[in-house]
C-alpha cells in the first residue's frame, strides 16, 4: 500500500487538478490542511472531503514544533511562550476544520480525522506533547518527501518518483508502506500531472492506495491491516 498525502493549501486550480486525477484513478488520499487559509474558500475544503478523502490538520498558522538554529543547523526545544502559542494554534486548527467538514461522512466514514502533520516536519518532545495533549492521535511525517514545489519540470518530478531522493550517501525510494509527502499549493504545479502518470505504474507494480486513518485507529493503536 502507498499513502498519498498533500500538505498546506492552494487555490481552486491545483486542488481541483489533484481531485480530478485521484477520482480518475479511484484513489483516496490524505490532505493535511493549513487551516488559516480555509475560511477564504471553505467550499473547496468540503469538495475534498465529499470526494471521500481524509482531512487532517497541518496546524493553523504553520507554527513549528521545534526551533531551528541556523548557526548550528540543529533543532532546539520551544520556549514556554512558544509552547503556549503552539497549543492555541493546534486547537484552533482542528476547530476550523471541524467547522467546515466536521459533518461530512462518505460511506459512513468521517472525513475529518485526528491525525496531525508537523509544519516543516520538525518535531521536539515538548512540541509533540502539546499535539497529543490537545487530542490528536498521531503525528505523521513521511518517509518520502518529494519537494514537489521545487520541481522545475514534470520530467524532474517523475524522475524523483521513479528513482528516489538522494540524502547524504543514501537514496530513498518509494516502497511498500511509503507515506509520500506532496503539496496542494500553487507552487506544486507538476504534482497532479505526475500522479496521473505514476498511479497506473504503481498499480501495475502491485500497489494499492489508502487514507492514513484506514490503517491507524482513533485510539492510537495500529489498525493491524
Model-derived regions: residue spans:
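Active-site beta->alpha N-cap acidic-glycine motif
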Residues: 1-81, 92-114
Amino acid at each position: 500500500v502507498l499513502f498519498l498525502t498533500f500538505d498546506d493549501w492552494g487555490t481552486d486550480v491545483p486542488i481541483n487538478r489533484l481531485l480530478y486525477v485521484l477520482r480518475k484513478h479511484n484513489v483516496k488520499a490524505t490532505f493535511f490542511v493549513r487551516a488559516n487559509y480555509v475560511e477564504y474558500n471553505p467550499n473547496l475544503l468540503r469538495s475534498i472531503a465529499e470526494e471521500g478523502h481524509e482531512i487532517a490538520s497541518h496546524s493553523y498558522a504553520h507554527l513549528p514544533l521545534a526551533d531551528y538554529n541556523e548557526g548550528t543547523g540543529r533543532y532546539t526545544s520551544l520556549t514556554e511562550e512558544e509552547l503556549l502559542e503552539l497549543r492555541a494554534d493546534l486547537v484552533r486548527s482542528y476547530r476550523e476544520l471541524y467547522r467546515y467538514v466536521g459533518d461530512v461522512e462518505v460511506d459512513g466514514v468521517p472525513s475529518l480525522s485526528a491525525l496531525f502533520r508537523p509544519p516543516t516536519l520538525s518535531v521536539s518532545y515538548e512540541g509533540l506533547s502539546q499535539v497529543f495533549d490537545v487530542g490528536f492521535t498521531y503525528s505523521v511525517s513521511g518517509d518520502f518527501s518529494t519537494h514537489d514545489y521545487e520541481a522545475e519540470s514534470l520530467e524532474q518530478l517523475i524522475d524523483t518518483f521513479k528513482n528516489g531522493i538522494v540524502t547524504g550517501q543514501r537514496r530513498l525510494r518509494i516502497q511498500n508502506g511509503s507515506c509520500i509527502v506532496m503539496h496542494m499549493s500553487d507552487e506544486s504545479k507538476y504534482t497532479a500531472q505526475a500522479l496521473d502518470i505514476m498511479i497506473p505504474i504503481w498499480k501495475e507494480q502491485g500497489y494499492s492506495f489508502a487514507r492514513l486513518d484506514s490503517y491507524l485507529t482513533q485510539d492510537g493503536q495500529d489498525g493491524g491491516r
